[in-house]
A protein has these predicted regions:
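Glycine-rich phosphate/pyrophosphate-binding loop and the adjoining helix
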Residues: 1, 29-30, 141-189
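N-terminal beta1-alpha1 ligand-phosphate binding loop
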Residues: 1-32
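Residue-level recognition of beta-strand->loop/alpha-helix junctions
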Residues: 7, 38, 158-159
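Active-site-proximal alpha-helix that buttresses catalytic centers in soluble enzyme cores
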Residues: 21, 25-30, 38-39, 52-55, ...
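N-terminal beta-loop-helix "entrance" segment that forms/cooperates
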Residues: 36-58, 164-175
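Helix-loop-strand module that forms the ligand-binding subsite of alpha/beta enzymes
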Residues: 60-145
Length: 189
């Protein structure tokens, strides 16, 4: 069992990263191998909508995303983690999500990659500063279609409101415990 965590925060030691680390630790407790992808440290350009991926399922842009396709395809479990920026993912996380159009093409158009949808699972961790009732609506919708593109039918989520300061989540051990349990559940299920 291999669990890949995609850390979409633009800064390190963020609330998002702390929760993702807890989830990955929970998965590791259940015997899973884990890998964290810190998108903020990678060079991932936005999708240019050139449709090169419609030809053979590969992206024409050569950057750090080239390696991540293999990481995503080989994962048994995927955790997408992002703070909420204007009711959506960060631009760093969204660039990675948009570039997964190549995987969607492989799966849905070219039929060259057919993952076992029953075996692959996912999770979303989203952290927002406000308490608005629709705070996570955009993130959840984007996550739904990201997970579809990467061959994940079912995903769980941890949505945390009211955190804005760097590493503020450390003052709320219940959120960290929930993230650890999310990782355990993901690895066990």
């Amino acid at each position: 069992m291999h669990v890949v965590g995609i850390m979409g925060s633009p800064r390190r030691d963020s609330n998002t990263e702390i929760l993702l680390d807890a989830a990955l630790a929970g998965a590791a407790e259940c015997g899973a191998t884990t890998e964290k992808v810190a998108v903020c440290e990678l060079h991932i350009l936005p999708c240019t909508e050139c449709y090169h991926c419609a030809v053979d399922g590969t992206c024409s842009i050569k950057d750090d995303m080239s390696h991540l396709y293999d990481v995503i395809v080989s994962a048994d479990r995927i955790i997408l983690a992002s703070p909420v920026f204007f009711y959506g993912l960060t631009s760093q996380a969204k660039a990675l999500v948009d570039r997964c159009q190549a995987l969607w093409m492989r799966r849905r158009v070219l039929k060259s990659w057919m993952p076992d949808l029953e075996a692959r699972k996912g999770a979303l961790i989203a952290v927002g500063a406000t308490s608005g009732p629709k705070l996570f609506d955009g993130v959840l919708l984007t996550a739904k279609y990201f997970f579809d593109a990467v061959g994940v039918r079912d995903f769980d989520h941890l949505l945390v409101r009211g955190l804005d300061g760097r590493a503020q989540v450390r003052d709320y051990p219940e959120h960290i415990s929930r993230a650890t349990e999310l990782g355990r559940s993901l690895a066990a299920g």
